[in-house]
Regions:
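Conserved hydrolase catalytic core segment
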Residues: 10-55
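Conserved serine/cysteine hydrolase catalytic core
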Residues: 105-168, 173-176
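Conserved alpha/beta-hydrolase catalytic His-Asp/Glu region
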Residues: 72-125, 129
Length: 205
């Protein structure tokens, strides 16, 4: 959140925050902060509520861990993605996947995220629960125009998490993106973009 505040301060004006997954939770923590909410003029939560669904979250972590030892080729990485997202047609040209991979000295391709993100989470339960409680409190303080976007096939923002968020932020608008999973932008980018533009056009400052 501190990094986000610094970026907005450099812009010199309030920001409409659009956050997916972890980015959504960071945006929520700012928009509902007692002091720093002054930097936010609007909030769009993309397939995330005050907490992720536990089963869906575990599935993502398992996918990330499955690539911890890297891939022999871009094709092998593409196979892993196809296994995780079986509903999405595998593109004929997979060269775009290279931007998400790093070729290291051992000749293998690795996802570019920080491996520390995947360290053993044993004993972190209380810490995570406290963070989620803070997000619940933040949600109750939200006063700016808000939109919650849900991928209809999502296992991260299920109907349970959706209803919890809408109850905490009763003025929030809601948009469901059909045939989209948690990866809303990658699944149905055109429909997602239309929902975002419509909301911002109505509420932008």
């Amino acid at each position: 959140r501190d990094d986000l505040v610094r970026i907005i301060q450099q812009l010199g004006k309030k920001a409409n925050l659009v956050g997916a997954s972890l980015g959504g939770m960071i945006s929520l923590s700012l928009a509902g902060h007692e002091e720093e909410s002054k930097y936010c003029s609007g909030l769009i939560m993309v397939d995330i509520g005050m907490r992720p669904n536990d089963e869906g979250s575990d599935r993502i972590v398992e996918f990330m861990r499955s690539g911890a030892k890297g891939f022999a080729s871009v094709e092998e990485a593409a196979d892993a993605v196809s296994g995780y997202l079986p509903h999405r047609e595998r593109p004929k040209d997979i060269s775009g996947l290279k931007k998400n991979l790093r070729l290291k000295e051992d000749g293998r391709y690795y996802w570019h995220w920080d491996p520390l993100f995947l360290t053993d989470r044993t004993g972190m339960g209380e810490v995570r629960e406290e963070r989620f409680r803070q997000l619940e409190n933040s949600a109750k303080r939200i006063s700016v125009p808000t939109l919650l976007v849900q991928g209809a096939l999502s296992d991260i923002l299920t109907n349970k998490e959706k209803e919890e968020f809408l109850n905490a932020v009763p003025h929030s608008k809601f948009a469901e993106i059909q045939q989209a999973t948690h990866m809303v932008v990658g699944d149905k980018n055109d429909i997602f973009a239309e929902a975002i533009v419509d909301f911002l056009s109505e509420h932008i400052e």
